Amino acid sequence: RGDRSLTLRPENTASVVRSYLENAIYGKEDVTKYYYNGSMFRYERPQAGRQREFNQIGVEVLGESSPILDAEVIAMSYSLLEKLGITDLEVHINSVGTNASRTKYREMLLNFLEPMKEELCEDCRMRMEKNPLRVLDCKVDKCKELTKDAPSIIDSLNEEERAHYETVKKYLDIFGVKYVEDS
């Protein structure tokens, strides 16, 4: 208020990456793993059920891209929640691939949605223009029913991306993480 400036962190990933870069940790370690827990803040008006201040627990792995590390992060987070007494967990996984795969999926999804466009709610028709993936998030029962057989984003992955995804699933099975595949 007034002439004062107050900075509150909206999330912690940027802080971790900044520290990693500013301290040249990337030159010292092949893989660096971080975890954090703390209060984060939203400036904009929060959506229903959300608060301006919230607690975030996060895990970051920097220095290497690996499906085994992806599975390890998921398994570690899963284990933490179980140890905190949170039971009946359901982990949902998928892969959005690269920009090329996302572009391919966007086209697949639009081809699927176009014949039913007039049956979709007004919000979904607008979403088709801006971000067709959002149509799959619609809460309107009729739209949910119309999109239940939409193509899976997994079908747009190239061979390397699909192998990465399959390896993540393999290691989640090894680590004993129960998961559901979302398309």
Regions found by a protein language model. Give the residues of each.
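TRNA-recognition modules of translation machinery and tRNA-sensing kinases, especially anticodon-binding
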Residues: R1-S183
